[in-house]
């Protein structure tokens, strides 16, 4: 049992209040596992472009834009119905903001939140996404019925439960999910052939294929989609689409001299002891995090 004071302390310690806090967390993660890419998930909202620019400068490797339509059965109903904006709006704003600030080549853009078809993937690519996340629909393909009791251990179809009698009800097969994604890929291939494009790479961030439908409906007559299809600003330089396969580096850090020390390496491989005195300055960040990562591996 935790007291209210203890709960508040834990909440404060685990929260991110600024880009600086996030940058420090990303730095910590890169220290612990230098080869691992760090992904930051942002909910689609007005002003997300400015936030994404800060996240990119904070050395994130991937920025994930999540739309309002997403949410698995474990998500609160209020989050599924009332949180965030469509991923299309957030993705378009982030892509443009990163291009305007010469940051687009530093991060991969990923989007999710209600993606269901190959058409959704193509639209996401045209708006700037390079990776695409499927959650709920992939779970449904293997048998999920969205009962929204994942956290109660009472899943009626045995997807999210540890109870043996319920797990016996699970009829899903890996092939079901594989077939779903095969048809997604086939739909994408058909769309590419229709518009005369050979590869997905040609689509990414290329708005010349986007236009609005000339359909007049009362509920959409006041919606302005100019920001999504406006191609007046031409970004002819597409060098940003080539990303490094390696995670961002923190550069030379204090622990590097220790990690290359022969005595340390011997102690690490033989589970022996190692002792060394070093001077730590206030500019040294995440001290010993890299060593902890090496020990964990």
Sequence positions of predicted segments:
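Glycine-rich phosphate/ribose-binding loops and adjacent secondary-structure elements
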Residues: 15-168, 284, 288-293, 297
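Active-site or pore-adjacent capping/gating segments
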Residues: 132, 140-207, 211-212
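Charge-rich, low-hydrophobicity low-complexity segments
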Residues: 220-297
């Amino acid at each position: 049992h935790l007291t209210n004071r203890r709960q508040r302390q834990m909440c404060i310690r685990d929260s991110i209040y600024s880009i600086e806090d996030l940058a420090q967390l990303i730095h910590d993660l890169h220290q612990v596992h230098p080869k691992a890419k760090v992904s930051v998930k942002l909910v689609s909202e007005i002003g997300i472009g400015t936030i994404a620019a800060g996240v990119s400068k904070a050395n994130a490797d991937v920025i994930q834009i999540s739309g309002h339509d997403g949410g698995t059965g474990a998500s609160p109903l209020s989050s599924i119905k009332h949180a965030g904006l469509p991923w299309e709006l957030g993705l378009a704003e982030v892509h443009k903001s990163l291009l305007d600030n010469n940051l687009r080549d530093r991060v991969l853009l990923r989007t999710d939140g209600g993606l269901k078809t190959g058409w959704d993937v193509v639209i996401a690519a045209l708006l700037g996404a390079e990776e695409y996340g499927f959650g709920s629909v992939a779970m449904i393909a293997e048998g999920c019925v969205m009962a929204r009791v994942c956290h109660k251990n009472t899943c009626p179809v045995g997807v999210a439960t540890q109870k043996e009698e319920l797990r016996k009800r699970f009829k899903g097969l890996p092939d079901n999910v594989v077939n779903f994604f095969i048809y997604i890929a086939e739909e994408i291939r058909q769309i590419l052939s229709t518009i005369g494009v050979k590869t997905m790479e040609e689509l990414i961030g290329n708005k010349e294929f986007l236009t609005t439908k000339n359909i007049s409906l009362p509920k959409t007559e006041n919606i302005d989609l100019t920001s999504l299809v406006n191609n007046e600003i031409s970004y002819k330089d597409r060098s940003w689409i080539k990303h490094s396969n390696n995670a961002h580096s923190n550069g030379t850090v204090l622990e590097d001299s220790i990690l290359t020390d022969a005595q340390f390496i011997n102690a690490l491989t033989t589970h022996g002891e190692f002792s060394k005195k070093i001077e730590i300055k206030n500019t040294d960040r995440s001290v010993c995090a890299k060593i902890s990562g090496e020990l964990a591996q």
